[in-house]
A protein has these predicted regions:
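An internal, D/E-rich "acidic patch" concept
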Residues: 80-137, 389-390, 394
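Hydrophobic alpha-helical transmembrane segments of membrane transport/permease proteins
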Residues: 35-83, 185-199, 362-390, 542
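Generic hydrophobic transmembrane alpha-helix motif, especially the helices
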Residues: 127, 156-209, 385, 434-475, ...
Length: 595
């Protein structure tokens, strides 16, 4: 008895030491990431190799001549001759005293404006999160209903793919035209009350809700396939208690992703805030990057990271409260994929989407996407199936050539993000800081940071998206690995002589790769959207390249006069999204059956 008590006491002490060590590593990761990011931002004006004084002169007045006297005056007034290190030290020392410095452009204090912008963004985030959770609930209802009635059901993801395939800037522009211009139900621009946030909240919440709904639906299907569901049902436990337990079990898997989605709602609203002229944190940080306003840029990035770290800690704490006992005792139930056969629609849907893209490519690749020989904004006809754009170019040709460009680039970036997320997710405590930082920085801000160093282009857009796109995959990997390693049979493997390498290759990895591959395929249209967003803002391929984002940007001013200039690239993007998600579901089932 005493020996058993001694063993239990030692085990509890080892667990406490592990938790303390893990918490210290996580805290150290966040601190190092925050410090490294601030230092990198402080060095940004000098990393591009251009004179910061010249960039500031051009930002203040494009007509003023860049004389040596004018540049010297700017360097002296802002202390640029001290170098980036001394400027960073001065900014940090002032921040500790409640002073974030003065704007290099306006000369006004930075902190009050950023605090007000953060308040606006948080309000918009809360309303967008409400829209996202409501939409995710609607998407998950069929899976939840069938699971309670004994059928482990995974949807084809058609509706969630449709929602995630809508670019936020395109959806925002559509809602602006319909809700504010045509119907006149909501104000079109500005921020003067909660009714100004309705259209922006819908534009931000609908794509996030489609993404969250698919992830949560997959997690629900996996939970309903666990053996304890059958045990509870046979034991006569009510459906209400089973439903509560299923929700608790599923939340433990997706809680880190919910935290990341909440953070991304704050940072990814740059385009939406720009379209609706909302004075939020994303728009303020975007303006600081464009203007090379270092104090405002540092403060904006700092606020984004603080919000990211707060929601990351909150999500991790809630998840630990849900799974604390199971993680400590290594009693996590094993998850298996639903044994349900592929439905007819799940087999036909990707074939239909692939056929549609193939027809688009066959019909459009032989056409010239650069030649302007048609009337401006010509409507669709037999000669112009998709119509013509504002410059008289064939939209079918431009969308077809843009499909090749965007799809190949998005696939390459998705594979890079999967590899990075899988590798980094295996060490969640060490890389928790970079993960939260990568998710806090929207692709637009990352694109601006990359463009400010290497210039605009497709390669810069791909680097920017890959630099931040791995974060959700890494978080998902960390959550899955934690649960897989807490299963009883995994805990018994070292006792049976199974080494670390074999344990991960033959037991952890097969249980991990299916959900991650589906997650990657679900993010493929999102990455294509991010590429389109950067192209829409002029940070991607240079004109007149037929890139999806640029085609969308060129057609947005004419949305009310000729909707077909936007409908064509948006439809192609929706088809790609639906095909990617439906193929991911089929791939996941085949992998599990082979395993």
């Amino acid at each position: 008895m005493s020996e058993s008590l001694y063993c239990r006491t030692c085990a509890r002490l080892n667990q406490m030491n592990y938790l303390v060590h893990g918490s210290l590593v996580t805290l150290l990761s966040r601190v190092i990431t925050l410090a490294g990011t601030i230092v990198l931002i402080g060095m940004l004006p000098w990393l591009s190799g251009r004179d910061p004084a010249l960039a500031l002169l051009r930002a203040r007045s494009a007509e003023q001549e860049a004389t040596p006297e004018a540049l010297a005056a700017i360097r002296h007034s802002l202390g640029l001759e001290q170098g980036p290190l001394q400027l960073l030290i001065n900014w940090i020392s002032g921040l500790l005293q409640g002073d974030a410095g003065k704007s290099w452009i306006s000369g006004h204090p930075v902190l009050p404006g950023m605090l007000q912008a953060a308040q606006v963004s948080l309000t918009l985030m809360i309303m967008s999160a409400g829209v996202a959770f409501l939409l995710a609930t609607v998407i998950c209802v069929p899976t939840f209903h069938r699971g309670l009635h004994g059928c482990s059901y995974r949807s084809t993801g058609f509706f969630s793919a449709i929602f995630t395939s809508l670019p936020e800037f395109l959806l925002a522009s559509f809602l602006l035209v319909v809700g504010a211009v045509w119907l006149e139900w909501f104000p079109p621009y500005g921020w003067n009350g909660l009714h100004y946030a309705v259209l922006p909240s819908l534009a931000m919440g609908i794509p996030a809700g489609g993404y969250l709904g698919r992830i949560f639906s997959d997690a629900l299907a996996a939970t309903f396939s666990e053996n304890w569901i059958i045990t509870w049902t046979v034991s006569g436990i009510s459906r209400w208690h089973i439903a509560c337990a299923v929700m608790k079990r599923t939340l433990s898997t997706v809680m880190p992703l919910i935290g990341l989605i909440l953070v991304s709602l704050t940072g990814s609203a740059v385009a939406v805030e720009k379209i609706f002229a909302i004075p939020g944190l994303g728009r303020a940080t975007l303006g600081a990057v464009v203007a090379q306003d270092l104090p405002a840029l540092q403060t904006g990035i700092l606020f984004l990271l603080i919000i990211a770290f707060f929601f990351g800690i909150l999500a991790a704490g809630i998840r630990y409260l849900i799974l604390g006992r199971a993680l400590r005792t290594s009693s996590m139930p094993a998850t298996k994929e639903p044994d349900e056969k592929n439905s007819r629609i799940s087999l036909i849907l990707p074939l239909v989407c692939a056929a549609a893209l193939a027809v688009l490519l066959l019909a459009g690749l032989s056409r010239d996407p650069y030649l302007s020989e048609f009337p401006r904004l010509a409507p669709p006809s037999s000669a112009l199936p998709f119509g013509a754009d504002a410059m008289g170019r064939d939209l079918l040709a431009r969308v077809a050539h843009g499909t090749v460009h965007t799809c190949i680039l998005a696939l390459i970036v998705s594979i890079i993000c999967l590899c990075l997320g899988l590798t980094i997710g295996l060490f969640p405590g060490v890389f928790v800081g970079p993960t939260e930082m990568a998710n806090a920085l929207p692709p637009v801000i990352a694109g601006l940071l990359v463009v400010s160093v290497i210039g605009p282009g497709s390669s810069g857009a791909a680097i920017a998206i890959a630099a931040v796109g791995w974060a959700p995959l890494a978080t998902h990997t960390a959550a899955l690995v934690t649960e897989i390693r807490a299963r009883p049979y995994i805990s018994m493997l070292p006792v049976m002589g199974v080494g670390w390498l074999r344990q991960n290759l033959f037991y952890v990895f097969p249980a991990l790769i299916g959900p991650l591959l589906r997650h990657t395929m679900l993010r493929l249209p999102g990455i294509a959207l991010a590429l389109a967003s950067l192209g829409f803002l002029g940070l991607g391929a240079a004109p007149p390249e037929p890139e999806w984002g640029r085609v969308l940007a060129e057609g947005m001013p004419y949305l009310e006069r000729g909707f077909w200039v936007v409908l064509a690239p948006a439809s192609a993007l929706a088809i790609l999204s639906v095909m990617g998600v439906s193929l991911a579901g089929l791939t996941g089932r085949k992998i599990k059956q082979r395993a």
